[in-house]
Regions:
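Ubiquitin-like/PB1-type beta-grasp interaction modules and other compact soluble beta-rich domains
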Residues: 1-80, 84-85, 91-102, 113, ...
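Auxiliary tRNA-acceptor-end handling modules of aminoacyl-tRNA synthetases
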Residues: 53-72, 95-103, 107-291, 296
Length: 298
């Protein structure tokens, strides 16, 4: 006789028995729930987990689709992994940085040693669609952090190396998609076939990864031009460069080496300089007859 466990589904307040070690995806199918959109993740005792997560004790489970913020993050992370895999295959020497949520999508900086052409974007999108059609499973791997550092170091992923070296964790989870390896702080979908809608377009000097609308996931978010917001993000990156901070690992290392106060002082100096520039701009506009009545600083 199989050992069973009790699962209480919060979506319909029904409890059922399942074999110990059942995955959340198996449990979802067992409850025969009727969602208007694809279920992408679940909350197990109010903690977000991927659908490949296996349950070994009695739990409360609530399944989530893309309309939930946690579900949307799972979808976007999984989509970013597909984008990374496509780019790494098409441009082995290139570097991809998913930088900012802007224009109701995600701005991506792709460095391939030249300007990005429309043909490049078309090739990336085509390869992403092929990866989705292949329905490749995402695998989560647990290993000793020193082993994970070695794996990412061999692949030249120095930002991941610094992050893991300063995480303070003895063991680390990373993900594989075919022969592609990456690190994500959060859950991914069971396989690439769970992605049903996306777009990738040229956007200023980079790419814009478009995602489904949260309220109506059957359509993409409308692109809203946000030049000023993009400029603010880019200025923030320049400030980080001045402070020697390219990623979270750099920040962690700076703090470990006792430079936290220096970082704060430099950041405050940059902010004071920016405020002075705003004051100069207000003054010069007044000289030209364009009196400023209201200034909003976020």
């Amino acid at each position: 006789m199989k050992h069973m466990l009790q699962i209480c589904c919060k979506n319909n307040n029904i409890s059922k028995e399942f074999p110990i070690g059942s995955s959340l995806l198996d449990i979802y199918y067992g409850f025969n729930l009727n969602f208007p959109y694809q279920v992408v993740s679940a909350k197990v005792n109010n903690r977000s987990e991927g659908l490949n997560f296996r349950v070994y004790n009695n739990k409360d489970v609530e399944f989530l689709d893309i309309r939930d913020s946690s579900g949307m993050r799972t979808y976007v992370r999984s989509l970013c992994f597909i984008l990374y895999k496509a780019v790494s295959e098409l441009f082995p020497e290139g570097k991809l940085f998913v930088e900012h949520p802007v224009s109701k999508g995600y701005f991506c900086n792709l460095r391939i040693g030249r300007s990005i052409e429309l043909e490049d974007v078309t090739a990336i999108k085509k390869r992403m669609q092929e990866i989705i059609a292949e329905n490749i499973p995402y695998h989560r791997v647990e290993c000793h952090t020193t082993e994970a550092v070695r794996i990412f170091s061999e692949r030249g992923m120095n930002d991941k190396v610094k992050l893991l070296e300063t995480s303070g964790s003895l063991y680390t989870y990373y993900y594989t998609l075919g022969d592609t390896v990456d690190y994500y702080y959060g859950n991914l979908l069971p396989s690439t076939g769970f992605i049903w809608l996306f777009d990738i377009v040229k956007y200023y000097d980079g790419l814009l990864l478009r995602i489904p609308n949260k309220e109506n996931p059957n359509v993409l978010e409308e692109v809203v031009k946000q030049e000023k917001m993009l400029d603010v993000f880019k200025e923030h990156l320049r400030w980080n460069y001045i402070m020697g901070l390219g990623n979270v690992g750099d920040f962690n290392m700076a703090c470990e080496e006792g430079h936290a106060t220096d970082l704060i002082n430099v950041a405050e100096a940059l902010q004071e300089k920016k405020i002075a520039q705003i004051a100069d701009d207000i003054y010069h506009r007044g000289e030209n007859g364009n009196r400023v009545k209201l200034v909003l600083i976020s």
